[in-house]
């Protein structure tokens, strides 16, 4: 069986699934210290440390047998583990990430997405056109 690696992206859901599994592992081994702490509580720091300690061995297997190694995503995981509790703080962190140029960066980043969407719409229109004209005998009979 060929192993496929898909380390390019990691979703928040992947991290939360891994956190649940680590917490269940701690419960199974009767290591119950701060297991019930909420992410916003200061007691959750022990869970964060446990996550960081076991990150090198972390693998998430998806249902189509792809797997992701989480050790490649340390920076994103650190960012997700430091949740902001206020909208103002979240906004300030977002602005500082782009050095105060959030508008320009957001515009630049969205351009390829719009191009992808245009290409996808054009490809879908071509497929519909081919389906609609497939039964025609000649080019003159096409009405699309």
UniProtKB/Swiss-Prot annotation:
Keywords: Transcription, Transcription regulation
Function: Involved in late/very late gene activation.
Gene name of the record: LEF-11
Entry similarity comment: Belongs to the baculoviridae LEF-11 family.
Bilayer-spanning residue ranges: none
Pfam families the UniProt entry points to: Baculo_LEF-11
Cited InterPro entries: Baculo_LEF-11
The keyword Zinc-finger is annotated on this UniProt entry: no
Any Gene Ontology biological process: regulation of DNA-templated transcription
UniProt name for this protein: Late expression factor 11
């Amino acid at each position: 069986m060929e192993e496929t690696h898909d380390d390019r992206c990691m979703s928040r859901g992947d991290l939360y699934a891994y956190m649940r599994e680590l917490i269940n592992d701690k419960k199974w081994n009767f290591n119950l210290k701060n297991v019930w702490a909420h992410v916003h509580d200061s007691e959750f720091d022990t869970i964060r440390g446990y996550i960081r300690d076991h990150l090198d061995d972390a693998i998430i297997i998806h249902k189509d047998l792809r797997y992701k190694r989480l050790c490649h995503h340390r920076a994103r995981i650190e960012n997700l583990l430091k949740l902001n509790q206020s909208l103002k703080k979240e906004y300030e962190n977002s602005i500082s990430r782009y050095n105060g140029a959030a508008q320009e960066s957001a515009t630049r980043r969205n351009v390829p997405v719009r191009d992808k969407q245009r290409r996808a719409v054009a490809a879908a229109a071509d497929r519909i056109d081919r389906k609609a004209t497939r039964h025609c005998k000649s080019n003159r009979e096409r009405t699309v």
